[in-house]
Amino acid sequence: MRKFEMSTKASTMRATVIKLHLFVAAFFAPILLMVALSGGLYLIGSKGTTERVALAVPETIVFDEGATDLKAEVSDLLRQLGQPTDFEYLKTSGKTLITRPTSRTGFEITRNEAGLSVTEVRPDWIKTIVELHKGHGPTLFKNFQKVMAVGLLFIVISGLWLGLTAKGLRQNTLLTSAAGAIIFLLLALS
């Protein structure tokens, strides 16, 4: 009787893990497909493009790139130019300030010998998903990506566990996992 109880508990746990595995995989399928698509496109050289539009900046506009609250200074500049100010944060690249996220239309602000230049940068759909993949999207999306990473770990670990604990799948699971690990190591270390 005790063996039957253990078997029933084990099969109930297995059924629960299978359901969780399937639900988590289904829930994260859209973002995992986006990551696979954007990563694949990026690796074959299709990184997307941006349309860049130089904005007219009147000489009367004052902009202090040394301001204590640079985000407020950039927001004020964009407001004076009649542009949206809904960026989340700034990235500095050399002498250029870049509004983030870069997964949507943003701006680059540069001071050079000719004065202040502001460029509107509009990504196409490929550039948008590549930027999301790289973690350059909105903060809420980046937090979702962190949760998705945990979900992906669960999907892989639960899939391995399900394969290793099923007598009929154990050998194939071990062989396939070993082959994947060997190929990964050979390619990564080559």
Please describe what each predicted stretch is.
Residues 12, 73-76, 124, 128:
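Exposed alpha-helical structural elements
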Residues 2-49, 140-190:
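Internal alpha-helical transmembrane segments
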Residues 35, 39-91:
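Membrane-proximal low-complexity regions enriched in glycine and acidic/polar residues
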Residues 17-24, 77-80, 112:
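A broad, low-specificity signal for short, low-complexity segments enriched in glycine/proline
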Residues 85-109:
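Exposed beta-strand-loop-beta-strand "reactive/processing" segments of non-cytosolic proteins
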Residues 102-149:
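Extended, hydrophilic extramembrane loops/domains of integral membrane proteins
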Residues 27-35, 82-90, 113-119:
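Short, mixed-charge, low-aromatic patches
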